[in-house]
Amino acid sequence: MSGRGKGGKGLGKGGAKRHRKILRDNIQGITKPAIRRLARRGGVKRISGLIYEETRGVLKVFLENVIRDAVTYTEHAKRKTVTAMDVVYALKRQGRTLYGFGG
């Protein structure tokens, strides 16, 4: 027994035995003032109270779609790290071309 715990394979390359923090209600991290600032940038003067939850929902769906596509590109390339280019290609696939991040 080398006293390295369950995943002890020596240096590096220690399987997928890390503890993952359970993610709950992270969408609430998109705060009311943050949504208000985005709306102001878009030229909105007055905002209904119901907008905030609706915006969080729409943003969540949008990000899920982009991230799913970006991860698909990453997996296809047999990588474990999602690159900026994966996200650029994912956005392009959805018809939202983004300039300024290479490619």
UniProtKB/Swiss-Prot annotation:
Residues 17-21 bind DNA. Residues 1-20 are annotated as: Disordered. SMART domains: H4 (SM00417), TAF (SM00803). The modification N6-methyllysine is found at residue 21. It comes from the Eukaryota. The modification N-acetylserine is found at residue 2. Residues 1-14 have a biased composition (Gly residues). The modification N6-acetyl-N6-methyllysine is found at residues 6, 13. Core component of nucleosome. Nucleosomes wrap and compact DNA into chromatin, limiting DNA accessibility to the cellular machineries which require DNA as a template. Histones thereby play a central role in transcription regulation, DNA repair, DNA replication and chromosomal stability. DNA accessibility is regulated via a complex set of post-translational modifications of histones, also called histone code, and nucleosome remodeling. Disulfide bonds: none annotated. Keywords: Acetylation, Chromosome, DNA-binding, Methylation, Nucleosome core, Nucleus. Pfam families: CENP-T_C. Gene3D superfamilies: Histone, subunit A. The modification N6-acetyllysine is found at residue 17. This is Histone H4. InterPro entries: CENP-T/H4_C (IPR035425), Histone-fold (IPR009072), Histone_H4 (IPR001951), Histone_H4_CS (IPR019809), TAF_TATA-bd_Histone-like_dom (IPR004823). GO terms for cellular component: nucleosome; nucleus. Belongs to the histone H4 family. It is found in: Nucleus; Chromosome. GO terms for molecular function: DNA binding; protein heterodimerization activity; structural constituent of chromatin. The nucleosome is a histone octamer containing two molecules each of H2A, H2B, H3 and H4 assembled in one H3-H4 heterotetramer and two H2A-H2B heterodimers. The octamer wraps approximately 147 bp of DNA.
